[in-house]
Amino acid sequence: MYMELYLMFSNFFKSIRWCKVPAFMQAKVEMGLVNEVELKSLLEQETDSPQTNAASLMEQGSLRERRAKAPRNSVVQSFKIVILSNKLNLLLPFGPLAILVHYLTDNKGWFFLLSLVGITPLAERLGYATEQLSCYTGATVGGLLNATFGNVIELIISIIALKNGMIRVVQLTLLGSILSNILLVLGCAFFCGGLVFPGKDQVFDKRNAVVSSGMLLMAVMGLLFPTFLHYTHSEVHAGSSELALSRFISCIMLVAYAAYLFFQLKSQPSFYTEKTNQNEETSNDDEDPEISKWEAIIWLSIFTAWVSLLSGYLVDAIEGTSVSWKIPISFISVILLPIVGNAAEHAGAIMFAMKDKLDLSLGVAIGSSIQISMFAVPFCVVIGWMMGAQMDLNLQLFETATLLITVIVVAFFLQLEGTSNYFKRLMLILCYLIVAASFFVHEDPHQG
């Protein structure tokens, strides 16, 4: 009897230990058709198969090699590498000059222009520092870093604008950031990559593009229903149902974005790194970092703080610039501000495309659009809810229709062949020009 109890508990604990084995294999063990040695061998094959570990092993080896080559620069050397090595940084003094003009004169137009020029080199350096940091983190996390540090500016501007009751500025700026990323940033990255590789169709992971397109379409769906509810006048409680629906959808979108991050970083790591590792094999000479990991983090913090400061001043100058330049506020919010706010993604995506790393370019441009639409927009709705501001997902009919058509066009291009050619490069840029022209002649009746 004791021997039977021992065998029963022994088999029980073995089943817990090997719970990852399929149920039919556990049944064969209990029936004596497979012994323990064979089962352990099958378990090792299941968990250590080449398909699941090849990409992670390649990336780990590449990361170890880069970390071993990490430079140790002094403060002066780091300053020379990051600040003095780029001719575009000659525009850096325009930032302090813009602040000086802001306090000494009332010319909002000049202040706005100087701020735009001053932010441009800072945003490019953000892309550079993020690329350096991605050398120590890997391709997937590197793409998320590019998107995150680029969108910090939009989040700061949005929260400040919400505090000031400028809900429409928040909506238009975030909308413009999405449009700029999926059309202008991606189109320019493809175009610059084509200039470096003129006779080559650059390849990207089509499976990744399909998932990204699905996320963008889900974001559009979340924005469509509050707009349709408003314009069909079918609310159960007029004035409150639209806001309640927006807050509910925002919570769902935040959960979906968290699941997307988990899927991208944990569940399917090889799914997203296979193509990037192939690109790294052909361009290892370009992968040696110029600054250390902590230098990159410090420079990222400095640049982000300075860009955010200038961006905050830009918000206050929007109305004055609209009057001075005689252009609609919607054009400034949807076109001009996002171009500067997305300069980090713009520079990063172009740099990656010029190194034939189109998956990283897509990770920056499309990843940033997903982060804005699935995180920044619903996050602002929730923050506005906490502040008592009636921020909703109703972007109005013209703006929502523009976003819907744009996402459909981009999703169609990304799912065609998994390649970039001159036709796609040209079409994306021309589509953005159409959008820009539309907002130049569009007067927003809800501004204010």
UniProtKB/Swiss-Prot annotation:
GO terms for molecular function: calcium:proton antiporter activity. Residues 31-81, 131-141, 200-209, 265-295, 356-363, 415-425 are cytoplasmic. Pfam families: Na_Ca_ex. Residues 103-109, 163-178, 231-243, 317-334, 385-393, 447-448 are extracellular. It is found in: Vacuole membrane. It comes from the Eukaryota. Coiled coil: none annotated. InterPro entries: CaH_exchang, CAX-like, NaCa_Exmemb, NCX_ion-bd_dom_sf. The chain crosses the membrane at residues 82-102, 110-130, 142-162, 179-199, 210-230, 244-264, 296-316, 335-355, 364-384, 394-414, 426-446. Residues 150-185, 341-376 are annotated as: Cation selection. Keywords: Antiport, Calcium, Calcium transport, Ion transport, Membrane, Transmembrane, Transmembrane helix, Transport, Vacuole. Vacuolar cation/proton exchanger (CAX). Translocates Ca(2+) and other metal ions into vacuoles using the proton gradient formed by H(+)-ATPase and H(+)-pyrophosphatase. This is Putative vacuolar cation/proton exchanger 6. It comes from Arabidopsis thaliana.
